[in-house]
Structure formats: C-alpha cells, structure tokens
Amino acid sequence: MAFTLEDMTEEEFEAFRGMSVQNYAKQNITSGTWTEKEALEKSEQAYENMIPNGRDSSNHYFWNITNVQGERMGWLWLYADPFHPQKEAFIYSFGLYEAFRGKGLAQLALQTLDERARELGAERLALHVFAHNETAVYLYQKMGYAMTNIRMRKQLS
C-alpha cells in the first residue's frame, strides 16, 4: 500500500497534541514513573518544554500518514537535531490508528520515515519506547533499531 507523509494542519496538530499528552501520561502511569495524580500535569509540562511553539517549534516535523485514498492512517513526529554530532534525528511519536494496525503498514511507514529523515540530513534515528509496549519493541528491533540503554526498577514496598 502506498502512502505519504503530509504536514498536519494546525487543527490536526492540536488534536494530535491532546491525544499525545493523554497517552504520555497514561504510559508513564503504566510504567510506574508517575502517579495518576501528577501524570497529566507532568505530561503537559513535558510537551510545553519539548515544543514551546507548538507545530511551529524549530526542527520538529508533524506528519499524517495518509494513504492514496486520502485516509489518515496514523501520525509521525520527528525532531531533526541540526546540532547533534552524529546527525541524529529523534522519533518522538509514531502510531497507526486501530483500523490500520496488524497489516505490516508500520514497517512501510518506518521505511518512508528513513527516507524523509535522510532528506533532512539525518544519518541515524533514535527513539524511546516504554518496555511494557512489547509490540512496539518487537517492531523497532525488527526494523533494525538496537537498545542503547535499559533503565530498571525494583519495588521495595
């Protein structure tokens, strides 16, 4: 299936940001990093720090993954760091909507992202994935991503 990466409109970005703030809070609760009480506020602050100018934040790219029929299949958020010594770009967020999952499209989307990142001058890509998201961990490893560090936790009480 062919698809493109299209810039999000301001309205699409605002919807994406809202969804992302909620999801980041949820993932940090699931991982045990934040409590439910503090999660939403911390998530909102993290997004404010990462993209203070919203969609217009420098070197941040917010794309819809769109098929040839014009359907929005998912999203990608990439930061192309012009100052990184190894010319590394960072994938802040990537996902497919439920109807498009499980069809091999994530692999194709990541291959398309590889090309776009190269066009932006990146020589390598990095990302963060929560350990409890085993499906994503498997996908990224299958696509050639290697673990660079592992953070572990032990509950004492």
Where are these regions (language model features)?
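Acetyl-CoA-dependent GNAT
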Residues: 3, 7-98, 116, 147-156
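Conserved GNAT acetyl-CoA-binding A-motif
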Residues: 89, 110, 118-128, 151
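Conserved acetyl-CoA-binding loop of GNAT-fold acetyltransferases
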Residues: 122, 131, 141-150
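Extreme N-terminus of proteins, especially the signal/transit-peptide cleavage junction
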Residues: 1-3, 120, 144
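Conserved acetyl-CoA-binding loop-helix of GNAT-fold acetyltransferases
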Residues: 93-96, 102-115, 119, 138-142
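Conserved beta-strand-loop-alpha-helix junction that forms the acyl-donor binding cleft
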Residues: 97, 101, 127-136, 153-157
